Each structure stands twice: as C-alpha cells, then as structure tokens.
C-alpha cells in the first residue's frame, strides 16, 4: 500500500473533505449519515408512512432511488432532450408498500424532482450533500454484489465467470466519485476499460476531436485508478503500458484480462464500507441520536452497533426463507459479498451459506409480482462480533504477493489463510508471454507461482466483542484451513440486468 500519508481515508473521500484528523472525519461522516436519516424521516412524514412501513427495506430503497434520480443531472438533462412516451423528466417515483387490512398493498407514487431535492437539501443544512448520495449508491451497489452474479457481463467482456470475486461495485453509476472508485474491484475497473477500448475499436471517432480528448482523459484517469489498486511493481508497470498506449486496442484488452486474472492471487486494494439502508439512519435520528456529535465511522464498530439496535422488515415472497433474506441483507450491509464465508460466519455468529443454497431472490419486488401472497418478516441483521473493514487485498507479510482464492476479496481485517486452487488459476496463464509486456508478465507469473495457499493473511488481526469499542482485545479465530468458503461457488444466482 502507498503510505497512508499520501492517501485520503475513505471517509475523507466519502465526505469530500481535505485531510482531517480522526475526530473531524468521524464528525463529517456522522453529519453525512445524519443528513440521510433526517431526509428519510421527512419523506416518511410526506408519504404518511406508519412506523412499521417506514422500517420496510423495500420502502427505504424506493425513497433512496428517488433522491438519487432527482440528483442525476446527466440523466435529467438527457430525459429533457429526448422525451420518451410516458416518462415525465421532471418527476420521479416508485413503489411504496403499505399495510391495509392485514395485507400488503403496492402504491405507485410520483413526486416532483425539485420537491425531493428541496427536502434533501433541507435535511442537509441547505447543501447538496453529494457524499450522502454516494453513500446510498454504494449501499445499492453492495446489495447488488450480494444478490447477483455478474457471469454474463464477465463473459461479454471476454473474462472468466470465475473471476466474480473481482467484481465489487460493478453496478455503481459513473458519477460515484472518489468514494465510489475506492470500492470498485479490479475486475470492475478492467471491465469498464475494456468496454471503452471496444468502443474505440468499433467507432473511429471515439478518440478523435474535442470529445475524444475528454474520452482520453477519462481513459487515463480510469487506468490510474486501477493502477492504484495493484500492489506489485510489475502489475503497476503493465498498467502504465496500457495507459500510455497511443491507440488502445486488442493488445491492451489482452493485458487487462491478464492483469484481472493475476489479481485472483496478487490481490488489489479494494475498500470496504458498511453502508446501511436510509431507514436505519432514520430510526437512529428519530430516537434522538446525534450522529455528528457522537461521530461515526464506516469501517469500525459503529455500523455493527447501529444494526444491533435496529429493527428492519422486509417483504417475503411465498417460497422464500426469511433467514436467507436476512443473510443477503447482512452481507450487503457489511459489503461482504466477496469475503470468505468462514470469516463472515464467525463474525455473524450464525452460518453464512453460499449463494446457491439460499432460498431467496433479490430484495426488490418487481411491479408485476402479486402482492396478495406477500408476507413480511424481521431481518436479523445483528452480529456476534465486529471487525475492522479492510482496504487491502490481504496480501501476506509484506511479500507484496499472496495466496488468493478464486473468489475472495477480504472485507474484514481478520487473520486467516486465503486458500486457492493454484492449478486452476495458473492454467489460465499458459502461453502468451511475448510482446511488449513480456518481462512484466513473466515477473507476475513468477510471483503467483511462489505464493502458498497456507500463508496467513492479516497476521494477528482478530474480531472484537461488541462491548469492546476501542478494539483492545482481539479474538483471533482459528479456521479449518482446508475448507475455503466462497459465496458464489456452484451457483445459480440470478443475473444482474440493468
């Protein structure tokens, strides 16, 4: 990792702040989530939601999506210039679920975007509070990561579906800023770059003219973000090659896919943040909690503590398992879709099952689903322990390279081995080491071959009791070393389609 001195912490990225000390960071992150909470309470009042309805995660998601859409400048402008039938560019809305005579009913609501913006600004001391908007985008992104497998998107860009552990943040919108870039996985960045290069190959004018100049700047910026995620000199050098290419084409795509594969073992630094649904912050604010005064952190005990004391409900379809639905949302709340299930299970205190064993579909309910048979249940979002979220790839003892597993990008800073099938991964690296990047490729392959699955990552790091807020007594769990736990193995999760 680059020394902390040159980087802003995630919270600073998230709150758009310059370098601040720990107390100031906690206060500004607190201000951000407090603003989300105040906005949520106001929206519940506007919509006349009962306490129970306000705690329904589906209602929370609709309200979050409305404010995100109200502030989506680019799309708003596009909608005004390309009026489509039946879409009012000045309005936003979605399904709100209400309890009527012992049944859940869906009501489609519509609001002026201007009105939503006014309520949002009012809840955020008159400011646009972009950080709070980004925070909600990351929560939606984490929910998508836990719910869907991006096999189709991977295959479309020529990558291997087994690389799904590199796809964190793949559904984040472009406008998610530095905080969004920090949580994107290596595969996500590679996919964005490949899409861009493919457009350049198919469209002669993509890199030309005034627009092309802007495109080029965006391309180089994305390359630099990806380069910053890699932790070995050879991987970074290859990124320089890709960035400096005069006319990016198939050679660059090859290099990027090679780099993505290498990240299965030589993992990149990807930030993890616990972003909770707006209703959770709303509940806390309503109960009189002052986030700004108390301070808040996305990577410490605070989100765990908040979830210990929040009761959130979810609609449940007839053949879904409420415990499985809870696991899905728990994983989303802690951005743990690509964490080792052994670690997640230990922290949560109940077994966390792979996606393929869950009897649950996504959290959102489609407009054509029958509400007659819908039930609701409490989401169990509490945990047994808490642990610090990591932004490193968990590479072992400074050897800049380490064991990975097809399918883990650690979320929690907790000691474990990262088992992987070296044969499976290395099989993808046969052949092609010629060309301009040959020495770098050789070096990367050498590092991968020398990594051992039994090496321990996050040496000495443990989990903490929920009463231990200063993290004084780490409890280092012992895991069955042979039994790796990856969420998307043997899987039949639905695809994410925009």
Swiss-Prot record:
GO terms for molecular function: RNA binding; structural molecule activity. Encapsidates the negative strand viral RNA, protecting it from nucleases. The encapsidated genomic RNA is termed the ribonucleoprotein (RNP) and serves as template for transcription and replication. The RNP needs to be localized in the host nucleus to start an infectious cycle, but is too large to diffuse through the nuclear pore complex. NP comprises at least 2 nuclear localization signals that are responsible for the active RNP import into the nucleus through cellular importin alpha/beta pathway. Its main location: virion. Homomultimerizes to form the nucleocapsid. May bind host exportin-1/XPO1. Binds to viral genomic RNA. Protein-RNA contacts are mediated by a combination of electrostatic interactions between positively charged residues and the phosphate backbone and planar interactions between aromatic side chains and bases. It comes from Influenza A virus (strain A/Goose/Guangdong/1/1996 H5N1 genotype Gs/Gd). InterPro entries: Flu_NP. One of its GO terms (cellular component) is host cell. This is Nucleoprotein.
